[in-house]
Amino acid sequence: QPSNAFWNDSKIHRFHLEMSEAEWEAMKALDTRKGVAPADSLKKIDGEQREVHRSRFPWAEGSLTINGEHLNGIGARYKGNASFNLMRGSLKRNMKIKLDWTNKDQNYKSIETLNLNAGGLDPSKLRDVFGYWLFREAGVPAPRTTFADITLTIPGRYEQEYLGLYTIVEQVNKSF
């Protein structure tokens, strides 16, 4: 499988994310606690209260360069709730990237979706990698991981801004 070489936790990949300022601003989370969701929608059908600490993260379009290979028309959004709030004020946040956002045939080594974990609560950046490895060693299906140094360009705002080292986690989907 072409993606096997990518999922190598002894290598640090190089990612560069770029999008317009308008798309960057569109990525801001819509917080359901601030009245976006009507009160009635916070109840389940059985009348119990729903989780009210969830944020919706809009998708934005941009481009991603992975190890020198440029991909246009990718979709990017933040992910997480507690982790998102923990990293408030920082450019380094957990993200989900869909490489086939505008072109359903686009991928990188057969990979269509990437989960970028910032590791805000893990200074070692090894917990996800070790945990998933341990599951696989025990015979339990678990996503593969690798690392990437990520930079960001928002023209007029950030130019090749270093976001940091991320853990990249395989998307659990049909091809998993």
Where are each of the predicted segments found?
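Phosphate/dinucleotide-binding and metal-coordinating scaffold of catalytic cores
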Residues: 1-176
